[in-house]
Amino acid sequence: VEKQTSSSSSKDTSSTKKNTSSQETKRIGNADYGYIDIPSKWIKFTDIDGTEAVQYTDGSGYNIVTLNSFTREKAKVPADIEFNAEFLAKKLAVMWQDNQDVGKMTGARTKVSGLDAYQLQIVMKSGQYLITWIFQKGEKVYTISFEGDAETLKTFIPYIEDTWSLDGTGAVTD
């Protein structure tokens, strides 16, 4: 999925929001990772690697959204190295570049709720997409990842880029 890095018009933004709001949604996340709206039918998912991140799936176990965040301490970054979204994006790219299952990896710049974000776009040899948005608010770096098929990804991008915030009003606890 190629992401345009040019700024979109307000008309584009309102039509994107209209598309996501026409589907019934629920708010998921927590105070540490932030919150996003997702389709109501999506369910909580627990990864076998035991990650602390918040994860939801459409029920397939293939299409999954993951919310996480990192402080300098959690990312194990020494005090003499600048810790920010760019650092974490580069660290993730290096981690993935030697993975033999990766077919293609590219990067882009985008926005998440008005915040500058790095986007790591990976297409696995299997055809599965793994897209991660990396952005910073204050001292914390947030990541939102989507893994799954191209069609679901296309519909999911507005949920990530338009609805993320630290406001958990109405969030579900399932």
Predicted regions and their residues:
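N-terminal Sec-dependent export signals
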Residues: 1-24, 174
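N-terminal "mature-domain start" segment
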Residues: 18-51
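A general boundary/transition motif marking the beginning of the first structured unit of a protein
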Residues: 30, 79-84, 148, 152
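Preference for bulky hydrophobic residues occupying beta-strand positions
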Residues: 36, 120-122, 146
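Extracytoplasmic/secreted envelope proteins and their assembly/folding machinery
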Residues: 36-39, 85-93, 132, 154-161
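Surface-exposed amphipathic alpha-helical segments
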Residues: 42, 141-174
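Conserved polar/disulfide-associated segments of primarily extracytoplasmic proteins
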Residues: 48-142
